[in-house]
Amino acid sequence: MDLNSLPGIVPTSSINILTLSGIVGDSAFVELIVAGKLIFSDSFAVLDGALELWNFGDMVIDAAGDAVAPSCSIRVSADGGGLGVSFIAVVTRIDLDYEGKLPDFNSNFLDSSAVTLAPPGARTALAAVGSDIRETGLPPLSLSFVNDGSDMIPDSMLVEGKLSGAAAVYEFDLPEKPGLYRADLGHRHHFFLVAQLGEHHVIFCRNCMNAPEYIYLRAKVTLQRTRTVNSAMIGGRAKEYDMKLVSEYEVSASGLPESLFIPVSLLPSASSISIDGVPAAVSELKTQLSRESDELFECKFTATLSRNLLTPANAAARSRIFRTQFDPSFN
């Protein structure tokens, strides 16, 4: 990724290889700051006015601690001037090589992951079950702004819940202010990263070892076709609450780093896939080396997304966040 055009929110998997051009001089001094702490500093040789930096994403992961989205800065000083870039790094893909060092993404909400990216003001919902819900009724959920991915700010919003079967459902609008927010309900927690997503998409899945993986892609998504289906027939008649809208999309991405090749290649065989929080299936995946570099690759696949059309809880699914099926592993 080009350091000159680094976005304000970036996945750790995309900053393992950083390039910077237009540097005057034979060397440059580089510093990496994560959550206010200097993590790395060193001098690098400049070749033909360009600089290539490696493994910065791995260093952010090592320094993140319990922060799911730490604030970071990269400073480059050279003879011809300097550059300072600040951004939020999101740990979006769990690599087995780093198991044990990463934040614990498992939560006790009925959601596919403990980190959700969503646009400002989006209508969302979280649901939870458990003995504490049954014993205490409906405790309020607390939503707080998080500073630098770690320090809590006292001001918070309380959200009242509603019973839906055995679950407590909390529906609310996310704040308009971009940033990281934490939802707390007893021992449960969930993070919302509020940002203008643009062409960025988050894929969550469970790999062949049933371990959670998060893949963050900047991709072009083209709708191919939609159809309405009824997933259940009772007494020969379709029930309205089983009505679903099934959409097929062509997803194409280029300039992907080598570190994402294996996770992306294995998507068709992964389970519990969701794209931007919506349950999905991946098929017809094709990959090839990028024309730009042998260290980058391109991919194209068909994503089939299914959304429930009816019931209040499933209406929240259209905000791309609410998980419509119960997953006991999160409770």
Report residues per predicted region.
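Preference for solvent-exposed, low-hydrophobicity sequence contexts
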Residues: 1-200
